[in-house]
C-alpha cells in the first residue's frame, strides 16, 4: 500500500501542472484549448533531448518556453486570424506532431538510460531519501501553483480573468482581449510543457504518442478537485487542480495494482466521467423540468 501511495503522490504532483493549465485556459479564459496533448509531448521531448546531452536543469525552463511558444501559435490563430479556439488548438496540435519528432531527432521515442536527470542528481546528493522524487515533484508543482495564484491577483491577472468573464466589457475598458488571451494561453501551455518535462525525466523516456488523452485526464482531475473543494475562489480553484490530480492518480494506481478494472478501460472511464461532469448542469435542468412537468400533470389530473 505504501508503494501505491508513493507512486500516486509522485504522479499526481508531476501531472498536476496540466490540471493547472486547464484551470487557466478552460475555467479562467473559457477557452477549450486542445493544444494540451501535443504540448505535453513537446515539453517531454525538449526536456529529454537536452537531458540526454547533459543539461537536465536547463531542460525544464526550455520545455516551458517551448510550451509557451505553442500556446502563442494557438493564440495567434485565434485572435489574429479568426480561427475558432477549438480549431486553433487542433491545427497547432497537428503541427506539433512534426515539431515533436524533430525535437526527438526524427525518432518516435527517446530514452535517457545512462543519463543523469534532476531526479537522479537529487538522489545522488542524498536529499529526500527514498522520497526524493516526490520531494522534487512537490517543490516544482507547489511553486508553479503559488506563482499562478499570485499572478491571478495582479493587475494583468485580473484583466485575464475579466477577459474570460466578459470580453466585450474588457474591450470597452480599453483593454486588448487578444493580448490577455495570448498571455493566458502562453502561461497555460508553459505549465503543460513543465509537466511534460518533469514526467519525461521521471520516466526517463518520451514517446511521440505519450500525450494522447492528456487533455481529458487533466479535465477529469480538475473536475474531481472542484467536486471536492468547489471553485468559489481562485485559491480554491488552484487547490482543486492539485487535489483532483492526486485523487485521480491514486484511483489509477489502485486500479493498476489491484486489477479491479482493466487498465485498458481507464481512459474510457475517464472520458465518461468528464462527459457526465460537464453535462451535469444540463442533466440537473432536465431532471428539474421533468419534476415540474410531472407536478403540473398531477395538479391537472385533480
PLM regions with names:
Residues 22, 55-94, 99, 141-142, ...:
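Alpha-helical transmembrane segments within multi-pass membrane transporters and channels
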Residues 192, 196-267:
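Transmembrane alpha-helical segments in multi-pass inner-membrane proteins
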Residues 3-55, 76-81, 223-231, 235, ...:
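Single transmembrane alpha-helix segments in multi-pass membrane proteins
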Residues 27-32, 72-117, 123, 204-208, ...:
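Short loop segments and helix-boundary regions at transmembrane helix junctions
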Residues 11, 86, 108, 133-137, ...:
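Loop-to-transmembrane alpha-helix initiation sites
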Residues 70, 129-215:
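Helix-loop-helix "hairpin" substructures at the membrane interface of multi-pass membrane proteins
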Residues 85, 89, 96-153, 182-183, ...:
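Transmembrane helix-bundle core of multi-pass membrane transporters
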Residues 165-172, 176-179, 232, 239, ...:
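Cytosolic-side transmembrane-helix boundaries in multi-pass membrane proteins
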